[in-house]
Amino acid sequence: MDTEGFGELLQQAEQLAAETEGISELPHVERNLQEIQQAGERLRSRTLTRTSQETADVKASVLLGSRGLDISHISQRLESLSAATTFEPLEPVKDTDIQGFLKNEKDNALLSAIEESRKRTFGMAEEYHRESMLVEWEQVKQRILHTLLASGEDALDFTQESEPSYIGDVNPPGRSSLDSIEMAYARQIYIYNEKIVSGHLQPNLVDLCASVAELDDKSISDMWAMVKQMTDVVLTPATDALKSRSSVEVRMDFVKQALGYLEQSYKNYTLVTVFGNLHQAQLGGVPGTYQLVRSFLNIKLPAPSPGLQDGEVEGHPVWALIYYCMRCGDLLAASQVVSRAQHQLGEFKTWFQEYMNSKDRRLSPATENKLRLHYRRALRNNTDPYKRAVYCIIGRCDITDNQSEVADKTEDYLWLKLNQVCFDDDGTSSPQDRLTLSQFQKQLLEDYGESHFTVNQQPFLYFQVLFLTAQFEAAIAFLFRMERLRCHAVHVALVLFELKLLLKSSGQSAQLLSHEPGDPPCMRRLNFVRLLMLYTRKFESTDPREALQYFYFLRDEKDSQGENMFLRCVSELVIESREFDMILGKLENDGSRKPGVIDKFTSDTKPIINKVASVAENKGLFEEAAKLYDLAKNADKVLELMNKLLSPVVPQISAPQSNKERLKNMALSIAERYRAQGISANKFVDSTFYLLLDLITFFDEYHSGHIDRAFDIIDRLKLVPLNQESVEERVAAFRNFSDEIRHNLSEVLLATMNILFTQFKRLKGTSPSSATRPQRVIEDRDSQLRSQARALITFAGMIPYRTSGDTNARLVQMEVLMN
């Protein structure tokens, strides 16, 4: 049969080929094997495409049919569904068709309400999402900013600092992260805060911090001496630090204090030099600055220098003696030299006497102009550098000349320029004779900058330059960038902050050092909050007590949301360190609170504890938050969080040291204490809490196999119906239960049905009847169990809560097995 079929097919093919060859108009097409294969693949793919849908339908039918689903019936139902009645436009009606008009109006009202509700819901969702993202981004932004020590150009400064390695100083886990200097500073801060909190007079924080410098090197001692000198000014009454710092009187005081520090430092330097070279110095005569300078010049100018003018006094150049007496800050000694050489100095004696007797070391405008004219005509190119320097200081002229022959060190240059700074503008001074403090500050900070002062080798020099020119914030920010000097920078900032001399950034998202619109050109602001938080981050996890002392300085500061920074920092500190009991206190068994470290700083600890609890709650630390709210006597929040914690563990099997066991013990302790002390919370929350505890007891009995006791508990709770008459009542009552109860409904129903089924099997397993248990009693009990099971099934179907399909299936299965 097959051979005949193939033979017939072959005959037809040969006949077709012969007919094709007989048509001469058609060209012959010849294909190689590859082309034939490609054509075959194309034909095959077309065939597969046509049959793939049919194959998919067959596979779907096989898969779903094995589960008892008829796919053809489902397809017919889906095709029969139409959205026309929902989404098609309403049909126009005649004006006289009242029924149609009313129907259209009703449909329009429904559609409008649905659309309005949809728009409102989507709008609220968008708004909540936007607010959530803004809050989250603000938190991320703060974390990013706090990880950056500096910003702008400083953030890209990768210059390697030449400092010793501190690898050997790394503390083991559990030890303090503070080194000896930082710990010494922390002790002084503790002493300071103790005095403040106790209501004593505010101690001098500069002196407390300066005492730490005795443990360190001379540079630190000099730094604190300078800080003490510069902060010893009388502030003018003002609403904020900017207005006070910008006042002419305060700025003049800063210059005066800086000059005093530089002069005293130089005098100390001359003393050290002279006593180190007593043989060459030949110190003698009446003790005083004059004799000290004479001895110093024996060392500095042992031989006559060419170009010095106007003779000598006791073997030393006149102008050199005058200059160095002024450099040591002793104008009386300089006046003594002027008096001895008055015949060689012309009018200078008169000018110097006026300069010395003036309140602010300033000549009258007429005398100043006269001296400047004399300087320009006769002294600008004078060969005596000391004479030029003295004239430039007294007349405050020729500010472009740095007098490098005399002022060869940075301190000398600072002293010279600060002497030339003027504050009043009488209009008579030419630009080359007028130097303002702002100009000098800009020159040092921006024109010269860090690169000019080789800050890596001499960091304290640049700090001194900025600090002595009243650029406190820039000086602190610079020193803070160096790890080994950071603690000193922070405590200088604390001193200025307490003295109300520090210019703080208006926002905490600002850079560590910033310039805000409206501020004078050379005024910088320091992000004090960020500075302090960056410093404490190093040790807040290992030394939370010390960190708390530093956070107390932020008690009057607010963040961008108006939140108290002390509260915020304390809450973050507690969450990070987990030292709840030590910082916030501990709840004793009798319900009293054992004070914590925070009690030293405030008498009302509830706001702080509530704040920490709120932060813990927002971070999802519900158990810790519940304990903290309990500490703050906030019963509503305690039970609300306990309900959230207990709900997921209610149906679990209890085991020693398990999550459920710990939470159950915690809840029982709270319940016993609240009942003993008569503490009550919101009625709804309170009833939910005690119902959850009863359900835990129910499941514990159920899992232990004590089904009769478990049944008695569920019967008393009236949570599920155990007869047909109470189904409606239980369904109505179910609407009043909280979500924490509803989430456990499936497990409660299954456990109750299991109890009924177990009792049913036990009943069936007993002997048919006995004297004590007649057949009728067994039948009545059998009927009762079936009725109770049917009530549970009815209840599960009527409640407005979506139980899982598996739960319903198991309930029905057990109910069927009982019938």
From Swiss-Prot:
The modification Phosphothreonine is found at T49. The modification Phosphoserine is found at S52, S66, S72, S75, S80, S430, S767. GO terms for cellular component: centrosome; nuclear envelope; nuclear membrane; nuclear periphery; nuclear pore. InterPro entries: Nucleoporin_int_Nup93/Nic96. GO terms for molecular function: structural constituent of nuclear pore. Pfam families: Nic96. It is found in: Nucleus membrane; Nucleus, Nuclear pore complex; Nucleus envelope. One of its GO terms (biological process) is nuclear pore complex assembly. The keyword Transport applies. It is a peripheral membrane protein. Its main location: nucleus. Keywords: Membrane, mRNA transport, Nuclear pore complex, Nucleus, Phosphoprotein, Protein transport, Translocation, Transport. Part of the nuclear pore complex (NPC). Component of the p62 complex, a complex composed of NUP62 and NUP54. Forms a complex with NUP35, NUP155, NUP205 and lamin B; the interaction with NUP35 is direct. Does not interact with TPR. Interacts with SMAD4 and IPO7; translocates SMAD4 to the nucleus through the NPC upon BMP7 stimulation resulting in activation of SMAD4 signaling. Belongs to the nucleoporin interacting component (NIC) family. Plays a role in the nuclear pore complex (NPC) assembly and/or maintenance. May anchor nucleoporins, but not NUP153 and TPR, to the NPC. During renal development, regulates podocyte migration and proliferation through SMAD4 signaling. This is Nuclear pore complex protein Nup93. It comes from Mus musculus (Mouse). The gene is Nup93.
